[in-house]
Structure formats: structure tokens, C-alpha cells
Amino acid sequence: MNLPVAIDYPAALALRQMALVQDELPKYLLAPEVSALLHYVPDLHRKMLLATLWNTGARINEALALTRGDFSLAPPYPFVQLATLKQRTEKAARTAGRAPAGSQVHRLVPLSDHHYVSQLQMMVATLKIPLERRNKRTGRMEKVRIWEITDRTVRTWLSEAVEAAAADGVTFSVPVPPHTFRHSYAMHMLYAGIPLKVLQSLMGHKSISSTEVYTKVFALDVAARHRVQFQMPEADAVAMLKGNI
């Protein structure tokens, strides 16, 4: 079996089950589970949105804002530019009225999976998604979003995929709203050895504390793997205290 990141999948699955006990820890899917879920998304346009969430860690509103111009797919280092909408919203809330022009926070996320990049190129070519389109009301040219849908539609797509998987005997032990892909991306990158500060930048977290929540899952793993023993034969303990050992 060829896994995208060399991890002990049974151990990772057991760790995830242990983490599920704590409500404050993120709910995430492992790479084989994401690939299996995508198998049950028949439409390429739908599948590539979910694959984009998985390959970039984007928030759903960030992904739905993407246009063709936000992607640079040329080798050797394809990437996507995401507007970090959560930080932008927070900044706007602190100022009177709208945020000043040019204040939008962006982040670059490398697209390191060649299969994803090739599928994205195929989708754009097949659906003939334009860069711009004239607004019929204003007459102005505007950038065209790749996925002109709402997050509610995405949730419906996911529900349909989960139902199709269940009908085929495949189930998932965590809920699968759009944000699950963001958590899954973060955990997948940590499994791949990406440093925490780098992950913070890729995720668009303003504070490192937001990123550190993912390392709490690995804290469970480290503690469990050490197999620390607390008990010794009671007779030996008594003898030790008496000075006989």
C-alpha cells in the first residue's frame, strides 16, 4: 500500500480515536480516509473543491473566494494565494466602517501534490472557467470565482458523499463538515514533519497558540508510546525500603 506520508496508519488511527475523547481537540481525517471520501464524489467540480480544502487547509470561505488568478500552477513550485478572511474580518471589526483598501491579508500555500495540480488544470480546461466576466448590472469586468456556490451547498455535497460511502460499507468515525479538511491538513502536515511555525504561516493563524492545539494530539501519542510503568513487585519495594536490596 502506497500512503502519501509514511506513517504507521493503525497507530495513527488509534491515536485519533484516543483524541476523540477530548472535545476540545480537533476532529480530523487521516489521508486514506480523505482519499476514500473523495472516491464517493462523482463530479470533478465538486471533488476539486474538497481536494482544495484538503491540499491547502483553507477555510471554506477562503476556498469559495478563489479565482483562477489566485493559482500559479507552473512548475517547479505551484502555489495558491489565499485571502486570510478570518484575520481580515477581525481587523475590520476593530475599525470604524470598512477595512481600508489594501488591508487584506494574504498567504501563499505551496501545492506539492502533482496529482492535485494536474486534476485542477484538467477541471479548469474542461469547464472553461474564465479569468474575468462582465457584470451585467454594472458593466464592469470582474474576477470569476471557480466555485460560485455557498458553504451550505458544500455541506450538502459532503453529506451526499458520506451517505454514498455508508451505502457501500465505508464509514467515518468523525463528522465531516468542511472545516474537518482544515484540521486534517494540519495533522497531515505535522505527520510529514512540517515545523510548527511554518504550519502557523500556512494555516493563516495569527497566534501560535491556535496552531499548538494540533500538537496536543501528538502529546497523547508520545506519552502512550513511552509505556511508562508505575508498579513494581510489592515485596521488592518493601525489601528496598528495608535496605535489603
Regions found by a protein language model. Give the residues of each.
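Basic, Lys/Arg- and aromatic-enriched nucleic-acid-binding interface segment
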Residues: 31-60
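DNA breakage-rejoining catalytic core of tyrosine-based enzymes
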Residues: 9-35, 90-114
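Catalytic-site neighborhood detector that most strongly recognizes the C-terminal catalytic loop/helix
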Residues: 86-88, 203, 208-228
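Short, basic (Lys/Arg/His-rich) helix/loop patches that form interaction surfaces
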Residues: 39, 132-136, 156-201
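Conserved tyrosine-mediated DNA breakage-rejoining catalytic core shared by Y-recombinases
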Residues: 65-122, 219
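Active-site/catalytic core of tyrosine-dependent DNA strand-transfer enzymes
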Residues: 112-172
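Short, charged phosphate-coordinating catalytic segments
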Residues: 53-76, 197-198
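C-terminal secondary-structure termini that scaffold catalytic or DNA-interacting sites
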Residues: 1-28, 230-245
